């Protein structure tokens, strides 16, 4: 792939600067948590109006990484059409609505986190709650807290297993969960 833009968190600045140099990336923005004057936030405030370009359903929208059924990571070329129909089909199957609030514990650089667990919810107007890093106790706390209102939770097997082994699992209120699912294991 030939990346054109890199948006990165300040915690990865050293690695990002090496990538920018090594991959000849011409555009970059650093996101700093809790800094409303970060490069990223300033770009959002001062950015130019978005100009759409003509595209087709077959045009690529992103390159995602997946281990698929083999367990070995590989780049998957995702077209506009694939992303759209994936969001529609998974959203319909899981009964996703604009009232859905999904807890996403998988990374968004991976197709599971983005295309299976985030995009279908966003496509239907729902909300996505992202965990920066998975912690079984914190995930149970988020699910248990009515202020978050989590209605859906999908993940690979490991997070489910870790949550079930956590001491707070038995006392967590799962009554608001309308949909849960597991997938992605070889």
What residues fall within each predicted segment?
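Conserved AMP-binding/adenylation subdomain of ANL enzymes
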Residues: 84-101, 109-151, 161-162, 166
